[in-house]
């Protein structure tokens, strides 16, 4: 009679307050192909809001898949709150993580918003009354508490993404990853989701990691990590990244030129002077 495989269920503790640490991480999709992630090292403290930016193919989305354990690097080390990520700890590690993807339509499986927010809680053996309280609290945090009995697919893009965020929040993760979470939304939807990200940042209760091309998200973050050809080529405060106009052009951001940056800021309610000098613009942004 074949032996049953014993399921490993490791409960992990926070060993330090470094939410995420990558050390010399390398990953390639196929043998003899160049590394999609090539010797990347960085650390993110708990409560920080960090953006990971770069053009398509730069390695930023590969990093997000490595963080959540979908991909395993060939070299290097990944730690979440001091716990090294490997096959025997990944189940425990994932309890620290929540992720919101680019297309909210791919995340709905229930017949109501309540069902979708509850997805993931069902395996946690939570009493029904407590589960409903968790669902309602998560929905209220993103302004969707009046939509709990609505059909998800009838919602707007911004509302769907808010439900996806509520679903992540219901699991009470310490780290939330937004993987291009605003890129498929209309301007109203983008504004709604970016405000939720800012609110989460201001609470400092969670670490926010956003894979993005969006200038507003970059400006709102505490730190920007810039990827190019699989390597981390710059890491610093947003204004440190934005000082270099040629650098912005080289990574093909959606709004790489100063005039477009000014327009983007004005559309989001920030009054800035006309200028073609990136340093002047960044200095002005940082004073506001």
Curated annotation (Swiss-Prot):
Name of this chain's protein: Energy-coupling factor transporter ATP-binding protein EcfA1
A molecular function GO annotation: ATPase-coupled transmembrane transporter activity
GO annotations of cellular component type: ATP-binding cassette (ABC) transporter complex
Species annotation: Spiroplasma kunkelii
Domain of life: Bacteria
Pfam family of the protein (one): ABC_tran
Subcellular location: Cell membrane
Binding site for ATP: 54-61
Enzyme class: translocase
Membrane topology summary: Peripheral membrane protein
Family, similarity comment: Belongs to the ABC transporter superfamily. Energy-coupling factor EcfA family.
Gene3D superfamilies tied to this protein: P-loop containing nucleotide triphosphate hydrolases
Record keywords, A-Z: ATP-binding, Cell membrane, Membrane, Nucleotide-binding, Translocase, Transport
Assembly: Forms a stable energy-coupling factor (ECF) transporter complex composed of 2 membrane-embedded substrate-binding proteins (S component), 2 ATP-binding proteins (A component) and 2 transmembrane proteins (T component).
Entry-linked InterPro entries: AAA+_ATPase, ABC_transporter-like_ATP-bd, ABC_transporter-like_CS, ABC_transpr_CbiO/EcfA_su, ECF_ABC_transporter_ATP-bd, EcfA_1, P-loop_NTPase
EC code(s) of this entry: 7.-.-.-
Domain ABC transporter, residue spans: 20-254
Function: ATP-binding (A) component of a common energy-coupling factor (ECF) ABC-transporter complex. Unlike classic ABC transporters this ECF transporter provides the energy necessary to transport a number of different substrates.
Lineage: Bacteria, Bacillati, Mycoplasmatota, Mollicutes, Entomoplasmatales
């Amino acid at each position: 009679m074949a032996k049953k495989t014993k399921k490993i269920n490791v409960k992990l503790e926070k060993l330090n307050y470094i939410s995420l640490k990558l050390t010399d991480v390398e990953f390639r999709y196929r043998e003899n192909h160049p590394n999609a992630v090539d010797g990347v090292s960085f650390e993110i403290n708990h409560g920080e809001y960090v953006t990971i930016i770069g053009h398509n193919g730069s390695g930023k989305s590969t990093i997000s898949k490595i963080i959540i354990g979908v991909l395993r690097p060939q070299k290097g080390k990944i730690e979440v709150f001091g716990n090294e990520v490997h096959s025997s700890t990944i189940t425990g590690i994932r309890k620290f993580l929540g992720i919101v993807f680019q297309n909210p339509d791919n995340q709905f499986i229930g017949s109501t918003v309540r069902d979708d927010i509850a997805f993931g809680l069902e395996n946690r053996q939570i009493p029904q009354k407590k589960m409903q309280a968790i669902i309602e609290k998560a929905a209220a945090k993103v302004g969707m508490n009046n939509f709990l009995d609505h059909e998800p697919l009838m919602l707007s893009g911004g509302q769907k993404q808010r439900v996806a965020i509520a679903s992540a929040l219901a699991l009470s993760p310490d780290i939330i990853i937004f993987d291009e979470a605003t890129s498929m939304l209309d301007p109203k939807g983008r504004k709604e989701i970016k405000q939720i990200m800012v609110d989460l940042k201001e609470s400092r209760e969670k670490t926010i990691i956003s894979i993005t091309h969006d200038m507003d998200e970059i400006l709102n973050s505490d730190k920007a990590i810039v990827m190019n050809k699989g390597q981390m080529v710059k890491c610093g405060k947003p204004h440190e990244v934005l000082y270099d106009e040629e650098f912005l052009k080289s990574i093909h951001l959606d709004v790489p030129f100063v005039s477009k940056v000014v327009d983007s800021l004005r559309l989001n309610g920030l009054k800035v002077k006309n200028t073609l000098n990136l340093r002047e613009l960044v200095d002005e942004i940082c004073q506001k």
